[in-house]
Structures are given as structure tokens and as C-alpha cells.
UniProtKB/Swiss-Prot annotation:
This is Dihydroxy-acid dehydratase. It is an enzyme of class 4 (lyase). Disulfide bonds: none annotated. Its cofactor is [2Fe-2S] cluster; Mg(2+). Homodimer. The keyword Amino-acid biosynthesis applies. The lineage of its organism: Bacteria, Pseudomonadati, Pseudomonadota, Gammaproteobacteria, Enterobacterales.
Length: 616
């Protein structure tokens, strides 16, 4: 029988000092026999996805204490990728994931907490906490802050839905008036919550639900809706029960490594492919799997990507649907239900509810259950009012979207495409693989060939795009932006957004060892591995080199002779200590970022630390 971790600090005469300090936090004698549960919050006023979380930690804590536990709150950092975008701040985004994971480990192990409720929401916070949860392997439930309502405004007497990416594209489009650009900017992000499309934050929150670590509705129920309160309350109550099952009944099935097993990771990735999620999810799932010592690799993702259809199309891949529409169509459980009917899921998995997949879908898939409470839950919709308050409204759609032929979520036989929304490509330009979000690629661009235009920084590429120096048919190659080479693996949302604003979104390709925002669409190929700084062939590309992309056959190729490629490699190695570094880039890199770069692996390994360098 496992012993409560917290007993290390609450029992025994030699822990008198620790108990004295616990008493100073408000604990009493009666509390020293209860489980101590960490409420891991991520409130900050810097990030709209987290600005409303301040009081939600106390909401969870109150339920923990009412159910017989002791709640102790702490906060992690949270970087807003949108605000950090387009300047040196983006270098810090991905490295913050490792800091978040480490900080959770530090706090939970230093104070011997028994379990956790993780309150996350945005891009690197959910994966950072997930990495920590699988590293620590103590009972955990995730509950996110929820998605933002889609922006809405009238243009030419037509009501349109908007999100952050629309504001960026319009702002850079010289054909758009200042007045229209400002109108869209003001309407694009109307409420608190994670940005309203299937960007990285919402993708990851959907995946925690698919992994079984979050409650049904977590990925899609709006941040502003009153119904979301119940998720926080139930998380607080249920974590106490899970904690007691593990420590008092030796039930290891409640632990995160038991729930988020390889079969669950495959289900989560299957969901991701079916809904055309952010390519960043590939990085984060690979990283989390390594923390949990789960044998889940890019090869598994490649295998799944070849058999899973595209069942749910959401912004930025279409302007028609946002997360509020996904929720109306049944949310994550609705997509999983269609995947299950298609025979594409592993059914032998469980979740924090203690239910298997079949029983979960029987209860929570709107196509299988006519339960009034369930129907009411998934009719929760937007109010269209600007607010930063959670639970601020209780509007409901008149009816659910159960149209599986032409609705937001579709059955396999009516899929948007029989090829899924993500694909792994490989070839001499990316020997260890690269990722493309096929959900956002125009069908006419699935096979593409063009001359390379090489840039050694995102900033240099943006200058060329806005300066009119990029032409239809060009293949932009942005290198030395990988985990080590950046360092920090910047997102390339600005280059892709500016290509659209210049009318080149469907006429050019972009290849990088960096990554892309979940808001990216178009022929954008990222995570090229090995990265340039690790000796990858992307470092050897020269202006004018022909590059061939064939998504249907999963191939990417630098179309030059192998002898020429070998010669260029020898020439690069001849640079000595300057080999595999940018030739002409001025970028200030802090000591903190250099420390990250010294241990970073390429994207095919999740951009995690190289354990071999740490002796394990």
C-alpha cells in the first residue's frame, strides 16, 4: 500500500518544524491526516486565456476541502504566444514549457503533495503541466480555462466570425483600409479564454480530454459560460476520490501513466488528425510521452496520419467554424464518437471518471444519448458580449448540430477528406521527418515544386515578404530557427500571415526547422529534423535550389545531386566551430536561452532535453 507522500512532512516528531510551518498556512491538527492536493494554477493578467483564472483556483480548492482534502495553491508562469509573436519574445515560448514542467515538479516534490489539479489553458502551459503530471505520476485532473468566443463583426452588411489571425492578416494587407483593419482588430478577441479557433491551446485542451486526464466538455465549453463552473467543481471533488483510491486502496489505475497509456496517446493523436489540430501538438505529445516513459514516436504519428480521415474543420482551416461550433456539435466526445464508429480508436482505455471508452461515449456522445442534461450542456453557446469574467453568461443554442453529413463534425463517409488533417513528410531535406497541417493546405498545393528562397531568420523572411521580393511559386526556407538554432523554435505565424496578406498564401510554400502557430494555414511545413543547427540538410539549401513537396506520398526532397549535397556538407564542416550556425544573423541570445539550447533536441523528439547529456 503506498504511503501518502505528504506524511513525510506531517508525521513524526522530527517534522515538528514542517508542521509548525504548515500551521502557519492555516492547517490544523485535523488536516495532518488528510491528502494534500496541489492546485496548480496559471493565472496571469498578461494572457487572455488566463486572465480569468485567479478565482478559479479557490473554487477548486473549496471543493477539495469540502470533500476531505487539503488544498494548496501555487502558480506557474504563462507566456502569450500572440503577444510574444513577431519579436524576440517568441524565443522564450517553447522553452517556457520546460520551465513550467520543472516548476511543477519542484513545488510538488519539495512540499510532498499527494495529487494535483492542473488549471491550464494556453499554448505551452497545458503541455508543460502534462509533462510534469506524467513525470511525477501522482493522481491528477486537468481543467482548462476554456475557449474564447469567436469575434463577430459586420462587413458589407454581412456578419462574419473572426479570430486573432484575421486581425493579423488584415493589419498587414495594404489593400485593407485603416478603418476596416481597426474594426476587425477590435472585434477579433472579444472575451477571456484561449483563442477561438483550433489553434494550439484549444487543440491541447481537447487532447487532455481524449487522453482521459480531463472531464468531458473540457476542450470546447466556452470560458464565459456558466456551465463551465461545474467542471472546476467536479475536478475538485473527484481528485480527492482518485487520491484516496490510490493511497488507501493501492489502485494504480487512477495514475496518469495508467490512464494516458500508449493506447490513449494513439487515441489523442487520432483525434488531433481528425480535427486538423495544431502541428505544435505533435511536439507536445512526443514530449509528454517521453516523460511518461511511453514508447510513442513520430513513426506512430506517421502511421496514424495515413489512416485517419479529416472529420472536423475549424478555423484557421475554415472561416465557418470556431470552438463554440465544435461544442454545439458535441465537442471532443462527438468527434471521438465518429472515430469510434469508424473503428479507429483503442477501446481499452479509461479516464479520470473511471469509465472505459465505450461507456464514456454512451453517456457523452450526443449522437448516442438523448439525455436532457447532456443536450443542455452541448447547447451552451456564446453571448457576444465583451468580458474578462468566467461564467458570465448562460446563453444556449436553440438546437444542437447533429448533422454528420454537412455539419461541423462529420461521419467518416462524409469526411472533409479521407486523408487526415496532419501529415508527416520525410526525404533528403528532412531525414527524421517534418510536419504539415494538411487541413489548411489548398488541394491544388498538395504537390508543389519551386525554387528555394533561403532565410536565416524569421525577421529576414518577413522583410522580404512585405518588401515584395517573394513571387508566386517560391519555396521560402527559414532555417536556424529550431530548438537549438533559434534558440527556442519560434513560431512562423507572421510569415504565413503576411504571405496571405500579400495574396501569396496559396501560391508559395514555407519550410522551416522552426514551428508554426496553431493559427497557421497554407502549405507550411515545419519541425524539419534534423534542424540546421544539428547538421540537418536544411542548412545546405541555397537560393534557387528546386524543392519538391508531395503530400499524398509523404515526401519532401531537395532536388539536387547527392554528390552536390555531400560537397556542401564538407564545405559546411570546413567552417570548424562556426559550422551549422547562421552566417549573417545578429540576434541577442540570453544566458537562459543558451542554457536551453545546450540541451535541446530536434523536433522529431519533441524538442525535449537531451537526456544523454545529463547522464540519463
Amino acid at each position: 500500500m503506498p504511503k501518502y507522500r505528504s506524511a513525510t512532512t506531517t508525521h513524526g516528531r522530527n517534522m515538528a518544524g514542517a508542521r509548525a510551518l504548515w500551521r502557519a498556512t492555516g492547517m490544523t491538527d485535523a488536516d495532518f491526516g488528510k491528502p494534500i492536493i496541489a492546485v496548480v494554477n496559471s493565472f496571469t493578467q498578461f494572457v487572455p486565456g488566463h486572465v480569468h483564472l485567479r478565482d478559479l483556483g479557490r473554487l477548486v480548492a473549496a471543493q477539495i476541502e469540502a470533500t476531505g482534502g487539503v488544498a494548496k495553491e501555487f502558480n506557474t508562469i504563462a507566456v502569450d504566444d500572440g503577444i510574444a509573436m513577431g519579436h524576440g519574445g517568441m524565443l522564450y515560448s517553447l522553452p517556457s514549457r520546460e520551465l513550467i514542467a520543472d516548476s511543477v515538479e519542484y513545488m510538488v516534490n519539495a512540499h510532498c503533495a499527494d495529487a494535483m489539479v492542473c488549471i491550464s489553458n494556453c499554448d505551452k502551459i497545458t503541455p508543460g503541466m502534462m509533462m510534469a503530471a506524467l513525470r511525477l505520476n501522482i493522481p491528477v485532473i486537468f481543467v482548462s480555462g476554456g475557449p474564447m468566443e469567436a469575434g463577430k463583426t459586420k462587413l458589407s452588411d454581412r456578419l462574419i466570425k473572426l479570430d486573432l489571425v484575421d486581425a493579423m492578416i488584415q493589419g498587414a494587407n495594404p489593400q485593407v483600409s485603416d478603418a476596416q483593419s481597426e474594426q476587425i482588430e477590435r472585434a477579433a478577441c472579444p472575451t477571456c479564454g484561449s483563442c477561438s479557433g483550433m489553434f494550439t491551446a484549444n487543440s491541447m485542451n481537447c487532447l487532455t480530454e481524449a487522453l482521459g486526464l480531463a472531464l468531458p466538455g473540457n476542450g470546447s465549453l466556452l470560458a464565459t459560460h456558466a456551465d463551465r463552473r461545474a467542471l472546476f467543481e467536479e475536478a475538485g471533488q473527484r481528485i480527492v476520490a482518485l487520491t484516496r483510491r490510490y493511497y488507501e486502496q493501492d489502485d494504480v489505475s487512477v495514475l496518469p501513466r495508467s490512464i494516458a497509456c500508449k493506447a490513449a496517446f494513439e487515441n489523442a493523436m487520432t483525434l488531433d488528425i481528425a480535427m486538423g489540430g495544431s502541428t505544435n501538438t505533435v511536439l507536445h505529445l512526443l514530449a509528454a510521452a517521453q516523460e511518461g516513459e511511453i514508447d510513442f514516436t513520430l513513426a506512430d504519428i506517421d502511421r496514424l496520419s495515413r489512416q485517419v480521415p479529416h472529420l472536423c474543420k475549424v478555423a484557421p482551416s475554415t472561416p465557418d467554424y470556431h470552438m463554440e461550433d465544435v461544442h454545439r456539435a458535441g465537442g471532443v466526445m462527438g468527434i471521438l464518437g465518429e472515430l469510434d464508429r469508424a473503428g479507429l480508436l483503442n477501446r481499452g482505455v479509461a479516464n479520470v471518471l473511471g469509465l472505459g471508452l465505450s461507456e464514456t461515449l454512451a453517456r457523452y456522445d450526443i449522437m448516442r444519448s438523448d439525455d436532457d442534461a447532456l443536450q443542455r450542456l452541448y447547447r451552451a453557446g456564446p453571448a457576444g458580449l465583451r468580458t474578462v469574467e468566467p461564467f458570465a453568461q448562460s446563453c444556449r443554442w436553440d438546437a444542437l448540430d447533429r448533422d454528420r453529413q454537412q455539419g461541423c463534425i462529420r461521419a467518416r463517409e462524409h469526411a472533409y477528406s479521407q486523408d487526415g488533417g496532419l501529415a508527416v513528410l520525410s526525404g533528403n531535406l528532412a531525414q527524421d521527418g517534418c510536419i504539415v497541417k494538411t487541413a489548411g493546405v489548398d488541394p491544388d498545393s498538395l504537390v508543389f515544386r519551386g525554387p528555394a528562397r533561403v532565410f536565416e531568420s524569421q525577421e529576414e523572411a518577413v522583410e522580404a515578404i512585405l518588401g515584395g521580393r517573394i513571387h508566386p511559386g517560391d519555396v521560402l526556407v527559414i532555417r536556424y530557427e529550431g530548438p537549438k538554432g533559434g534558440p527556442g523554435m519560434q513560431e512562423m505565424l507572421y510569415p504565413t500571415a503576411y504571405l496571405k496578406s500579400m495574396g501569396l498564401g496559396k501560391q508559395c510554400a514555407l519550410i522551416t526547422d522552426g514551428r508554426f502557430s496553431g493559427g497557421t494555414s497554407g502549405l507550411s511545413i515545419g519541425h524539419v529534423s534534423p534542424e540546421a543547427a544539428s547538421g540537418g540538410a536544411i542548412a545546405l539549401v541555397r537560393d534557387g535550389d528546386p524543392i519538391e513537396i508531395d503530400i499524398p506520398v509523404r515526401h519532401i526532397r531537395l532536388a539536387i545531386a547527392e554528390s552536390e549535397l555531400a560537397l556542401r556538407r564538407q564545405q559546411e564542416l570546413a567552417r570548424g566551430t562556426q559550422a551549422w550556425t547562421p552566417r549573417d544573423r545578429r540576434r541577442k541570445v540570453s544566458l537562459a536561452l543558451r542554457a536551453y539550447a545546450s540541451l535541446a533536441t530536434s523536433a522529431d523528439r519533441g524538442a525535449v532535453r537531451d537526456r544523454a547529456k545529463l547522464g540519463g
